[in-house]
Amino acid sequence: MPVSGITSAVVDTSASVSGAYVGTSGWSYPSWRPDFYPVGTKPEDFLRHYAERFATVELNTTGYRLPREELFERWAEHTPPGFEFAPKLNAHRRSDFGTFSQRVALLGERLGPIRAVVAAARDEGLLTLLLGSFDPSVQLALDLRHESWDRIEADLPPNAVRVGSLEGEAPFRYLRLREPPYSDGELAAWADRIRSLLNERLRVYCYFMHEDEPTAPRYAERLLELLAR
């Protein structure tokens, strides 16, 4: 069912707004046929089709089980230059940081921000370990879910931001829109916020939550349209 005020067709807007990386939280959803993926599209072709329309996607499977090396290489091969994956890291698995870093590096230039989910209370030792486990060139988006992490932004290095925060010293921001449905007016308001960040020469990554129906790509496409105005 089309979202009110938003067309059901998703067009190629991936390169229309410089600095804006807008996409969805995943791509491997058979229920997105036929409204997003054409009838007959095979699951192994979903990513290639998705990457023709958007420049980024959240890679949530890495937060539950780290895929084998060949899969990262295949994902990189199936996406065009300029496309970026945002892998998920569950920060409670401290012993896995090194392996995770090596594995996602196989994405090469397709590696975007790493979203590190931290459910625990503020722990400076964990933060130091997490930040030190990745090359300073790697963008880190910290998904800090305990209230004790409030006002941490000022203490983060130049390659790290807090998910959802519009503040920080890093040259990028990371937004997750998780409360659908979104009206066209609400998307327009987000477009205004993001445009302000782009005007500051910041890169902005923005992801819509997956639902069974392809509302997420519709929202993403509409947001890109609004940003391009």
Model-derived segments and spans:
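Residues lining hydrophobic/aromatic ligand-binding pockets adjacent to catalytic sites
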Residues: 1-229
